[in-house]
From Swiss-Prot:
Keywords: Endonuclease, Hydrolase, Metal-binding, Nuclease, Nucleus, Phosphoprotein, Zinc, Zinc-finger. This is RNA-binding protein NOB1. A zinc finger (NOB1) spans 260-332. Residues 136-147 have a biased composition (Basic and acidic residues). Its EC number is 3.1.-.-.
Length: 412
């Protein structure tokens, strides 16, 4: 018997060709999920499924409940109407077969933790197992306990660099070592060479993946468990959906059928108003409107807690954009200004009437381009500013002088 009794499948489960007959006993989905699948290979697999796919529409009350909850978590802009219906169907099946007493009505508060690594630093390299090494007692003593911040809420801004360790303990060790007998140079070289060979042998075998530890490594990297006593689950690969499901207390299943304990991904956090968004395509903050969004790694645990991992690397919050002054805003029909706000209005930059007649084949005075009597617009204002057709893109716009540019590129 399959470990999960009722499984709700998202489009990602069909696109990844998940063996849903091995994951669950009863497979549910909605018709919109099947409709949005366009590739031929997946549609061919849907035509000959080895299990019965049940279509069920969620009730409006559960759709409304999931919509309100996703707005509180901040994932509502990243969810489509199909995603919300899949979440509502999972909530409805959980209410029918298990109950809603253990589900959460409000998302938990965000817990903040700091990290020395850059947020885009790869934590796990494919093909290698890098276990975390515990700190030795000497390294723990070197830390400065008085300089540790009590409240880590603003540690990414106030404490970019770790405090310098105390050197009193090291000076005492040096004085003690000088009083002892100093060994000869030959003995030191022999001992150092033996230790180097020993360290090399330890390093060679420390990070390899072997048949003995591959299952343990897969569980550590994927943060998954074998589902036990799980009656209702949802198979999805979308982070926004996983975030909502975990924070509500519902079960999330991976494509291989494992139960996901944590969902790890990235969000954008405004360092001006401290609001977050999971829409990674945004450039300006939706709350304050400034261009102050920074990428932050987050981890959603199985209890629904959202942990944000800030970086103490000073390169994350660099002072780029404060060196050169912006150009004076220009007005008029053909003004070109840098894009500074999301709701900034720009002129339409239309072509002249003579230039539009070249592309309008239904115009009474249309002349083919191969004719020797064709006229080219070279004297109008739009022609001198190199304004092109709106279908091909607007005219050339002045860039922000503080923006980064590619190096070693020849200028025209």
């Amino acid at each position: 018997m399959a470990p999960v009794e009722h499984v709700v499948a998202d489009a990602g489960a069909f696109l990844r060709d998940a063996a849903l007959q091995d994951i669950g006993k009863n497979i549910y989905t909605i018709r919109e999920v099947v409709t949005e699948i366009r590739d031929k290979a997946t549609r061919r697999r849907l035509a000959v499924l080895p299990y019965e796919l049940r279509f069920k529409e969620p009730l409006p009350q559960y759709v409304r409940l999931v919509t309100e909850f996703s707005k509180k978590t901040g994932d509502y802009p990243s969810l489509s109407a199909t995603d919300i219906q899949v979440l509502a169907l999972t909530y409805q099946l959980e209410a029918e077969f298990v109950g809603v007493s253990h589900l959460k009505q409000e998302p938990q508060k965000v817990k903040v933790s700091s990290s020395i690594q850059h947020p885009e630093t790869p934590l796990h390299i494919s093909g290698f197992h890098l276990p975390s090494k515990p700190k030795s007692p000497q390294e723990a003593e070197k830390g400065h306990p008085a300089c540790e911040p009590e409240n880590l809420e603003f540690s990414s801004f106030m404490f970019w660099r770790n405090p310098l360790p105390s050197i009193d303990h090291e000076l005492q060790e040096l004085l003690i070592d000088r009083s002892e007998d100093v060994p000869s140079k030959e003995e030191e070289e022999a001992e150092n060479g033996f230790e180097d060979r020993k360290d090399d042998s330890d390093d060679d075998g420390g990070g390899w993946i072997t048949p003995n530890n591959i299952k343990q490594i897969q569980q550590e990297l994927e943060q998954c468990d074998v589902p036990k006593d799980v009656r209702v689950g949802c198979v999805t690969t979308d982070f926004a959906m996983q975030n909502v499901l975990l924070q509500m207390g519902l079960h999330v299943l991976a494509v291989n059928g494992m139960l996901i304990r944590e969902a790890r991904s990235y969000i954008l956090r405004c360092h001006g108003c401290f609001k977050t968004t999971s829409d990674m395509s945004r450039v300006f903050c939706a709350h304050c409107g400034n261009k102050t969004l920074k990428k932050v790694s987050v981890t959603v645990s199985d209890d629904g807690a959202l942990h944000m991992h800030f970086s103490r690397n000073p390169k994350v919050l660099n002072p780029r954009g404060l060196r050169y002054s912006l150009p004076t805003p220009k007005g008029g029909k053909y003004a070109v200004n840098p894009h500074l706000t999301e709701d900034q209005r720009f002129p339409q930059l239309r072509l002249s009437r003579k230039a539009r007649q070249k592309t309008n084949v239904f115009a009474p005075d249309y002349i083919a381009g191969v004719s020797p009597f064709v006229e080219n617009d070279v004297s109008s204002r739009s022609a001198t500013l190199q304004v092109r057709d709106s279908t091909l893109g607007a005219g050339r716009r002045r860039l922000n002088p503080n923006a980064s540019r590619k190096k070693f590129v020849k200028k025209r």
